[in-house]
Amino acid sequence: MLTKPKPNSKFSILFTFLLLLSFLIFVARSSDVAVEAGSEEELDDLEQLLAVDEQLQEERPEQQSEAETVSKAQRIVVELNGDNTKRLIDGNEYVMVLGYAPWCARSAELMPRFAEAATDLKEIGSSVLMAKIDGERYSKVASQLEIKGFPTLLLFVNGTSQSYTGGFSSEEIVIWVQKKTGASTIKLDTVDEASGFLKKHHTFILGLFEKSEDSSGHDEFVKAASLDNEIQFVETSSIDVAKLLFPNLKTNNVFVGLVKTEAEKYTSYDGPCQAEKIVEFLNSNKFPLVTKLTESNTVRVYSSPVKLQVMVFSKTDDFESLAQPLEDIARKFKSKLMLIYIDISNENLAMPFLTLFGIEDAKKTVVAAFDNNLNSKYLLESDPSPSNIEEFCFGLAHGTVSAYYKSQPIPDNQNASVVAVVGRTFDEVVLRSSENVLLEVHTPWCINCEALSKQVEKLSQHFKGFENLVFARIDASANEHPKLTVDDYPTILLYKTGEKENPLKLSTKSSAKDMAVLINKELKWKDQSGKDEL
C-alpha cells in the first residue's frame, strides 16, 4: 500500500478530491488531544484522560456518536514529532508506527482503521504503543525511520524496525500485531468468551484439543499460528465452545477448521496435524472463492502462494450474472488457480492490467490470467460465458493455453520504405523472412526515438534497391513477441539471414554513415557509405 511521496498532477480531478479529503481529516484531527508522550508521566496522563472519557461515555452511552467513537480511538494513537520520536521508540518495547501524509488518500483510508486497531489492542491489554507521524511535516524524522512512501506501517521491537506484512483492516492489523508481540493463538475456555470473540472476528482458524498442553497436535497448531501473519488462530478444549465457533463440527476429537464470512463459510481440515500442512491448507482456502480486488487487499492477493491468477474485469451489474458460476468454477480448480474480480470502471485497479494486454479501452467483460511463476499472461479471446471461462481455466490448470502477446492491428505497408511490424507479424516479417532485417525498436515516450527514426529513414533510402535488406520498426509499448526482449529504447537490431536467433545490436549513438559502414561490413557488401543520401 504505497503511493508516491508527491501527488501526480496528471490526475488533477483525483488530486482535488484528495485535498478535500485531507481537509476533512485535518478538521477531524483538530479536536485530537496533543500528546508529546516524552515520558512515562505523559503516557499516564493520556491513560487518565481516556479513563475519564470512558466514564463519561458510560454515563451517557445513548449520546455517543460515531464521530465521538472515532475521536476517542484517535486519541489513543500518539502523535510523533521531531522531539518525542526517539524517546518513545527507545523507551517502549513495542511501538507500531503509521507514517502518513495529509494529501495521501490511502493514508486517510487507513488512519481510522489504525485508530480502531489501537482501541482493540488497548482493550485486550496489549503493551504495544500505537503511534503515527506526519511524514511530510517531519520528513527528516520519517527518513530516519526509513519511511519511504505513504502510508507505511512499521513495528519497532526494542528500537529495531520490521516491515508490516499484514492486511489493512483493523482486525488484520490487530491480528498481525498480536502475533508479533504476544501469543500467536487465542485461548477460549467458555461459551461467553467465544460469543464475545465472534462479535469482533469474522475469519479465523479453530483448533480443538481436549487437553491442550498434552495434545501431540497442539504444538504443531501453535507453530502454524506463528508461521501465518494474517489469520487469527483460536484454540479450545471445550466441545461447546468449538461447536459455537464451528457449528458444522462432526467430531469430539482433535479438529482444525477454517471459518470465513463468504461462501464456504466452514471448511474442515482433514490432513495431518503438522504446521506446514496446516499453513498450506490455510493458504489454499483463506481467500473467498472469488476475491474482489480492492486497494486494501492488493498486497495480500499478489503475495498469495497461488501464483496462477485468473482476473475477471467487469462492470458491477454485468458481474452479477457471473458471480455464482465463477464460484462453482473456483471450487473445481481450488489450489490450482485463484479467481479474482476487478471492477472494470475502477481505473486505478483495472487500467494497469488492461494496459498490459493493450486493451485499456475495454468497456465490456474481459477475462485474463497471470502466471507469476512463469511471468506469462493469458487472455480469453472468445465470449466470456461461464462455459468458456471454465474451459479457459481448465486449459490454464493443465498448461495447454498459449501465452498472450499484445499486438496492434496488422498495418498496410504498401510502398513503405520502413516496414511497420506488429506482434502478429513479427514471425513473418523478421524471423521467417529470407531477407536481412534491420529493426528499429521504439516507444512513444522515448526521448531519443524520434531522432533515431530519422536516421533509419535515411538508411532505408541509402540502401534502396537492395532487395536482400528490409528496414522495419516496431512500437514495443503496443506489441510483444517472446523472441523480442529489449531493455532500453531506442534499440537497433540487425537480423542477418541464417542467424535470426542471434540479432546484432547496433549502437544508437552512431551516425547514419557509421551504421551504413557497419551494415556493409556485416552483410559483406561493397561499401556504399559515400552515396549522397547520407
Curated annotation (Swiss-Prot):
Reactions it catalyzes: Catalyzes the rearrangement of -S-S- bonds in proteins
Enzyme class: isomerase
Paired cysteines (S-S): 446-449
Active site residues according to the UniProt entry: 104 (nucleophile), 446 (nucleophile), 449 (nucleophile)
Motif placement: Prevents secretion from ER: 531-534
Pfam families per UniProt: Thioredoxin, Thioredoxin_6
Residues the record marks as carrying a glycan: 158, 415
Protein origin, superkingdom: Eukaryota
InterPro entries tied to this protein: Thioredoxin-like_sf, Thioredoxin_domain
Gene Ontology CC terms: cytosol; endoplasmic reticulum; endoplasmic reticulum lumen
Task performed by this protein: Acts as a protein-folding catalyst that interacts with nascent polypeptides to catalyze the formation, isomerization, and reduction or oxidation of disulfide bonds.
Protein's name in the database: Protein disulfide isomerase-like 1-6
Organism from which the protein derives: Arabidopsis thaliana (Mouse-ear cress)
Gene name per UniProt: PDIL1-6
